[in-house]
């Protein structure tokens, strides 16, 4: 059945996509968060025009063809927009078949382990970070926690002098020896400094060092990964499949972290997961907010063979992400350190009509 209309509902931060087929079947997806209003313009200009009138179930063909048709415009915005089409069509496919996307991919909806992911760095002291981790452990059953070290794109600087050396032992002492600790460097270090920080992390039993070097410096990151025994991880920023192949072939990191929305949707992320599986590498995607990206990631991780042990689950509320409240129902909630993969058809969630009523609207349709 052919795609008849493609609609977007957006604000600056979030953009939902509704795809409707000629028989009235619908599916909901989402472009990547942040500057979503710009991404929705790209969607209508450079994505929708190629999708209208094509087979709504030909997801893999569409997401492979559109970047070729727009080959003069490679890069992040096109992939962020493409995700809106891909994910809307996966939702439609699931609803047609009466299955969740997880089931379409060969998995089974179930509670999936998550790690408590802090987005704060300069806004919080080491003591306060450790205290909220303890509270979340006791309330939600988390056994794994991620926090920030260094300074974002920091050229070896710390967010403030001594912060990294303080927060790592502080969190370890607070949570005890059995908690799994993960840290994110956010492109902060040169290899020499990253290795030195990594040695300190190893001394405190940290198991995951994310994006230690500028993400575009693959050889720098590989140098760090080769030098350390803990897992060096990365890949969230990468939206080019050729770069993914390059990073996997050179084993730039120990754990691959694609972001479903940045990369262009489920079909492209599945390709990365297959390449990683063939290389013996696990996948632990980037899903750093509670928009639909975490829903997409839960479904994916419930199905792929090389899924890592956890899905990233943001612990930030309205003080940090005021825009993520009330987007869809049911809301994602962590209990016993797990979040259920939504079990209904498609993504298993409903977009909030009150949110849609306030959003900027645009429609592309068959002539």
Give the positions of each predicted feature:
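Structured beta-strand/loop patches that form or line metal/cofactor-binding pockets in enzymes
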Residues: 1-28, 32, 318-325
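Conserved, mostly hydrophobic/aromatic
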Residues: 3, 24, 47, 85, ...
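Glycine-rich phosphate/pyrophosphate-binding beta-alpha loops
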Residues: 11-14, 30-37, 71, 117-121, ...
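Metal- or metallocofactor-binding catalytic centers and their adjacent structured scaffolds
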Residues: 20-97
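Hydrophobic faces of well-ordered beta-strands that scaffold small-molecule active sites
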Residues: 29, 114-117, 143-147, 181-185, ...
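Shared catalytic-loop signature of beta/alpha-barrel
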Residues: 45, 61, 199, 205, ...
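Metal-dependent enolase-superfamily TIM-barrel catalytic cores that perform enediolate-based chemistry
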Residues: 111-112, 116-228
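C-terminal extensions of enzymes
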Residues: 317, 321-367
């Amino acid at each position: 059945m052919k795609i008849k209309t493609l609609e977007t509902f957006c604000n600056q931060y979030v953009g939902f996509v509704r795809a409707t087929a000629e028989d009235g079947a619908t599916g909901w997806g989402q472009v990547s968060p942040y500057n979503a209003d710009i991404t929705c313009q790209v969607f209508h200009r450079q994505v929708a025009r190629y999708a209208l009138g094509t087979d709504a179930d030909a997801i893999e063909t569409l997401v492979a063809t559109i970047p070729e048709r727009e080959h003069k415009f490679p890069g992040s915005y096109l992939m962020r927009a493409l995700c809106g089409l891909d994910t809307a069509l996966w939702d439609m496919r699931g609803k047609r078949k009466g299955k969740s996307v997880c089931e379409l991919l060969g998995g089974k909806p179930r509670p999936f382990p998550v790690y408590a992911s802090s987005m704060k760095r300069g806004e919080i002291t080491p003591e306060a970070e450790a205290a909220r981790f303890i509270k979340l452990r006791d309330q939600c059953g988390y056994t794994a926690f991620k926090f920030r070290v260094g300074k974002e794109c920091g050229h070896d600087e710390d967010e403030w002098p001594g912060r990294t050396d303080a927060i790592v032992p502080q969190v370890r002492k607070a949570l005890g020896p059995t908690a799994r600790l993960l840290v994110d460097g956010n492109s902060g270090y040169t290899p020499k400094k990253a290795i030195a920080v990594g040695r300190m992390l190893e001394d405190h039993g940290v198991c995951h060092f994310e994006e230690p070097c500028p993400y575009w410096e693959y050889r720098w990151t590989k140098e760090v990964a080769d030098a350390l025994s803990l897992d060096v991880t990365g890949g969230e920023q990468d939206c080019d499949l050729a770069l993914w192949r390059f990073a996997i072939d050179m084993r730039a990191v120990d754990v691959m972290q694609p972001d479903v929305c940045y990369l262009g949707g489920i079909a492209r992320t599945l390709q990365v997961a297959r390449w990683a599986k063939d290389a013996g590498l696990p996948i632990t995607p980037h899903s750093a907010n509670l928009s639909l990206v975490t829903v997409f990631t839960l479904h994916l991780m419930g199905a792929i063979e090389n899924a890592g042990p956890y899905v990233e689950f943001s612990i930030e509320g309205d003080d940090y992400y005021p825009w993520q409240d009330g987007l869809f129902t049911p809301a994602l909630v962590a209990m016993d350190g797990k979040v259920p993969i939504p079990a209904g058809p498609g993504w298993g969630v409903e977009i909030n009509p009150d949110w849609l009523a306030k959003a900027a609207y645009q429609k592309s349709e068959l002539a």
